[in-house]
A protein has these predicted regions:
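Short beta-strand elements in bilobed, periplasmic/extracellular small-molecule ligand-binding domains
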Residues: 1, 55-57, 106-119
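Short, well-structured alpha-helical segments in soluble
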Residues: 2-16, 123-131
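Short, well-ordered alpha-helical microsegments
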Residues: 3, 26-28, 95, 122, ...
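Periplasmic-binding protein-like
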Residues: 14-23, 42-44, 84-90, 131-150, ...
C-alpha cells in the first residue's frame, strides 16, 4: 500500500482528523491533502513540521519550548511591526528565555525597545517612553500573582499618558483567570500567546 492509496481511503471515509504521518518525508504531501479536503492533521511525532506555519489544518503536539519561543517571536514581529516595545521587569520573572530572545530579535530589526522595572515611577516611565503613540508591553512574568501588579502599573501609565495606546502581551496561564480579570484583559488590549492553537 502506498501513501496515495491510504489518502484515498481517508478521503472516502470522510475522516475529520488525521494523526500523523510518521515520516517527515510525507509531511508535504499529507498536509496538502489535508488542506484540500478540510481535514485536520495532528503531528505528535515531530516538531519540525514547517507546514504549521502556512497550513491552518496542521497542528503540532508536544512542541518543544524552543520552537514555541521562535513561533511566538515570529508572530509578535509580524503583528506588531514598527511598534515600540516596553519590557516590564517584575519581581516574579519566570519568562527570561522568551523575553530575552524577543528583545534580541526586536533590536536586530531596529525596533524601539524600552526596559523598566515594575516599581519604576510614572515620571521615569514617561521619560523612557517619550510620548510614543502605541506601546506593546511585555512582562517577564507569566505567574498570575504578578498580573495584578502589571494591571496597576498600566493603569497608572494610562492615566499619566492618556494619548498613548497600550497593548499587553500575556501568557497562556492567564487564560485560567479570564473570568476574574476579563475587564482588565480587554482594557489593556491583551494578546495571549498560547501553544494550544496556532493559525498564522
Amino acid at each position: 500500500t502506498n501513501l496515495t492509496d491510504i489518502l484515498s481511503k481517508v478521503k472516502n471515509n470522510r475522516v475529520q482528523f488525521l494523526i500523523g504521518p510518521v515520516y517527515p518525508s510525507h509531511f508535504d504531501e499529507v498536509s496538502s491533502f489535508c488542506r484540500s479536503n478540510g481535514i485536520r492533521m495532528i503531528v505528535p511525532f515531530s516538531s519540525k513540521a514547517k507546514q504549521v506555519n502556512v497550513n491552518r489544518y496542521v497542528y503540532l503536539l508536544n512542541t518543544p519550548a524552543e520552537y514555541e519561543k521562535i513561533l511566538a517571536a515570529d508572530l509578535f514581529l509580524k503583528t506588531f511591526k514598527g511598534k515600540s516595545v516596553l519590557f516590564l521587569h517584575t519581581n516574579k520573572a519566570d519568562q527570561p528565555d522568551f523575553t530575552q530572545y524577543l528583545r534580541q530579535r526586536l533590536l536586530v530589526q531596529g525596533a524601539t525597545v524600552v526596559d523598566a522595572n515594575e516599581d519604576a515611577t510614572i515620571a521615569q516611565l514617561k521619560t523612557a517612553l517619550n510620548n510614543k503613540r502605541h506601546i506593546i508591553v511585555v512582562p517577564d512574568a507569566s505567574d498570575v500573582s504578578a498580573l495584578q501588579n502589571v494591571f496597576s502599573k498600566l493603569s497608572e501609565v494610562r492615566q499619566a499618558m492618556p494619548k498613548t495606546e497600550l497593548s499587553l502581551i500575556g501568557y497562556s496561564s492567564w487564560l485560567n483567570q479570564s473570568d476574574r480579570y476579563e475587564g482588565e484583559l480587554f482594557l489593556n488590549d491583551t494578546y495571549i500567546f498560547t501553544p494550544s492553537y496556532y493559525e498564522p
